[in-house]
Amino acid sequence: MSIALCIVSISFLAAPHSSQAMPETPDRWFAYRSFRPASEPIGQFAELGVETVCIFPANTDCSLGVPYCASPPIWTGPGRYDFASLDAQVSLVLDANPKAKLLCLVDLNTPHWWVRLYGRQSGFEDTFYNQGKTIATPKWREDTKAYLQAFLTHMQTTYPGLVQGYVLACGGTTEWQDCSWGEESATRRAAWRAWMKERGKPDPIDIPPASVREHVTHGIFRDPQEDALAIDYWRFAHWITGDGILYFARAAQDIVKHEAALGVFYGYILELANNRLLYEGHLDFDRVYRSPDLDFFISPGTYHDRQIGGASGYMVALESLRHHGKRFLHEIDHRTHTSKSTVALGVAVPGHTNGFPDEQATIAGLRREFSLALIEGTALWWFDMFGDWFKGQAVLDAIGQMENLWEDFASESRESASEVAMIVDAESMLYVDGKAPIVREFMYNQRAGLYRMGAPFDIISMADVSDKDMMQYKLILFPNLFVVDDAKREVLRSKILRDGKTVVWVYAPGIIDGKTYDPAHVETLTGHAYGGESLTSKQMDGWTSVFAPKPNLPAPVLHDLAEKAGVHLYVDTQEPVYANGRFLSAHTLDGGDRTFRLPRKCARVTELFSGRVVAENADTFTDHLDAPATVLYRLDD
């Protein structure tokens, strides 16, 4: 296929339906998932009231070297599909729970036979680890689209109304993670050349070598002139991942026609730190979030700070998803004290060392994840990965109680209580050395301090600030706003730098204006000279500018900044706290008496896991927390 034909195929077929109205958002699922679904746990969860089950009829192996799915592959050869294997997996669920509804992952990764059959050609590689080398290959797109549409047609016609949502799964760990480090293939090179030409830029002929695409001119920063080719290439590398997602989302909707929800794992700007964020293709999320063909997004709870006593948290800019009318599903895959954490090859499941050590810790940890999902308005599934994640009557009883609380409260409209926002910028990370250790400090590690400052917060993409109401936020943190051009400067002026807000700038805010790198830009934007060692504050015209020369502000500093900004602080203990207008939750490792301050007087405050009324007609109360524990308070007027 010629270069021109290759790129026409990509650009045309990935275009969204311009006339398609935004689809309805899916339900807030409370679901069960497993790589090894079995009758007993599905039946046990059904007895708890959990009627939604996620299946993954996969064709490929996972990163631990074992198959994702114990059943035979479905995609067995060119145009050959063994739907008897798929039907058997559906039957297993329905036999265990005849009332079940399904969520279903669709494996778009290259089967082993496909790589062997076509892999002598450049660009015909295993998408699990080389997604970026193959995602622009027309043959792969066409074959995989045919499989996807045949799969969906079979499910939609054989089991009408059974599947509530499909998940398009591809790339590393089926989460659209490109592990190819930007390396070349013939089809990637063709797509890159066409992408540059479409934007009126010179034909680059080749993909820049590692010495060019990894080069930084100013410390950790690329120069917008000297390193322009590298910046363009990394922008393309993320774009092509987003383009692949949108291509298959449109292909799926040609069959599903918005009768079931459609989702992906994507947008991990908070989680993919150094050695990952620049390389793995997730920085096109602003465009993907806007797609009318996608309804929901998924990620596991963060793998940072997930231990008992940790704060947990999300990998994505959750408030931006809400802003675009999308839903989010929180994957609770946290290792419990009963988890099968070593697979057949003797390899431990990632995150095992931060697992919950005993039954009490498991219950406290699962309650933390549940409370976070309930308060943030997300869906969830309990991921019984390789089996035995949720064993023992006490653990099952705890999940059953949480299901009852979900039934009682999940349908309520969410009332935000956040007066703090962290605004993250995808574009700026294209200008940063992807391997620099400091990258971990900007967003990945910063979440821990935010969750412990004593107040709830939102995470928003800079791309959404221009058309989002920002009035509720009193304290705004910019952990990585390194590129500020004229358009961003105007957004900041009109939406952020006003109304008495306190704005915290981190490390090198605005050091690049899109055309030049100049440390003087920092002072022009913030009123503070670039550099220094300590936090400095300056009163501006209608707002307060705070400059933090070092990233990853700790909880005590954030607590003090929030207090000075007039943010309501629920606690002073530097332990994880989550809140919205109707709920307050806290998680503790050590336990003891804790005093909570409410933003208003409440007629009744009830701790929902114990059923205790802990306060009446009060705006403060003290409660005793076990060690470890998660508490969830209902705030009734």
Positions of predicted regions on the chain:
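Hydrophobic faces of well-ordered beta-strands that scaffold small-molecule active sites
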Residues: 28-32, 53-55, 102-106, 164-168, ...
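Short, acidic/polar
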Residues: 34-46, 151-154, 275-289, 362-370, ...
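Aromatic-lined carbohydrate-binding/catalytic grooves of carbohydrate-active enzymes
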Residues: 50-84, 269-283, 292-299, 303-305, ...
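Polysaccharide-binding and catalytic clefts of secreted carbohydrate-active enzymes
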Residues: 107, 115-303, 311, 317
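Aromatic-lined substrate-binding rim segments of carbohydrate-active enzymes
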Residues: 39-127, 152-154, 247-255
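Bacterial N-terminal signal peptides
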Residues: 2-12
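Carbohydrate-binding surfaces of carbohydrate-active enzymes
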Residues: 258, 291, 295-637
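An acidic-aromatic substrate-binding cleft motif
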Residues: 22-51, 234, 420, 427
